[in-house]
Amino acid sequence: MEYQLTLNWPDFLERHWQKRPVVLKRGFNNFIDPISPDELAGLAMESEVDSRLVSHQDGKWQVSHGPFESYDHLGETNWSLLVQAVNHWHEPTAALMRPFRELPDWRIDDLMISFSVPGGGVGPHLDQYDVFIIQGTGRRRWRVGEKLQMKQHCPHPDLLQVDPFEAIIDEELEPGDILYIPPGFPHEGYALENAMNYSVGFRAPNTRELISGFADYVLQRELGGNYYSDPDVPPRAHPADVLPQEMDKLREMMLELINQPEHFKQWFGEFISQSRHELDIAPPEPPYQPDEIYDALKQGEVLVRLGGLRVLRIGDDVYANGEKIDSPHRPALDALASNIALTAENFGDALEDPSFLAMLAALVNSGYWFFEG
């Protein structure tokens, strides 16, 4: 299924992206759910899938984490089932992510899907990432507040909420409506009837993650082996003093590594192309031989990217799931990065190069791409 998003992107980016929340009425016309509540509940029974149940009764909140064995204990009100990265495990839902590729792939994270019964929700809270919340089956009331300093508290160890807030948006969403919320705006949603919601979340690494990730890269490659030296050690009034110029020199030693463009590019490509959630990787058995890949493509078969696989381009280099893809065939690499589905035409002359075919076979045999059907 193909989803057509009714949105003036230039206007949206100028007025709302990372600035102001907005309700996009009928963002998807004639919206059809790509997954049923039963299918979602089935996914939450799988150990590889990240899921949780959130419920509340008389002001008391409960959170439990999957995999779940049964839902028989649940009542008819006040609970939600939330499943992360459903686009990794259920191919039809991945189609919901594609209309949002007007925004950079490296910023898109995953598709979280929730099923809620009347009164179900997770309470008023803040997120530090952008999110588009698509209303599927059913109706849900959403309230969004102004971006202010707000106290957060934990009504349950696994649930972070904010105090009640005054709403700047108070809307009832119907199938196909979309609520966009930038980082830091408090919000809460409660189902008015059995309801499905689809949250396209965006990824924004913080400074701590970046420094930690780069430090891992430095350690793995044994970079930064230069030692501090001070042949012109300056005199000081007290032997315990560390002088400002020494602090500057130490900081420069660290910055020197970050300021090497090739290393920084290689690290960031590996770092940002890794998914934060497990992928449904299923290497083919038996593995494909390069000539089988060639024949299949030439016969018109379509090669499809695994749901949730992050394929990103930095300059001329392409990265997939933390690995750099090496090949001199730039147009073919661009096709891998740009297209979800690929045909022989996308690869062009690269298919006549045995080394490219061997590389493509390795990617398919890793489970990163698969033949449709």
Swiss-Prot record:
Deletion consequences: Cells lacking this gene grow similarly as wild-type under standard conditions, but show reduced growth under low nutrient conditions; this result correlates with a bulk protein translation rate that is lower by a factor of three or four in the deletion mutant strain than that in the wild-type. Deletion of this gene also leads to loss of uL16 (Rpl16) hydroxylation.
Keywords of this entry: Dioxygenase, Iron, Metal-binding, Oxidoreductase
JmjC domain segment(s): 92-219
GO molecular function, one term: protein homodimerization activity
Cofactor, free-text remark: Binds 1 Fe(2+) ion per subunit.
EC number: 1.14.11.47
InterPro entries: JmjC_dom, NO66-like, ROXA-like_wH
Subunit structure: Homodimer.
Protein name as it appears in the record: Ribosomal protein uL16 3-hydroxylase
Organism listed in the record: Escherichia coli (strain K12)
Gene: roxA
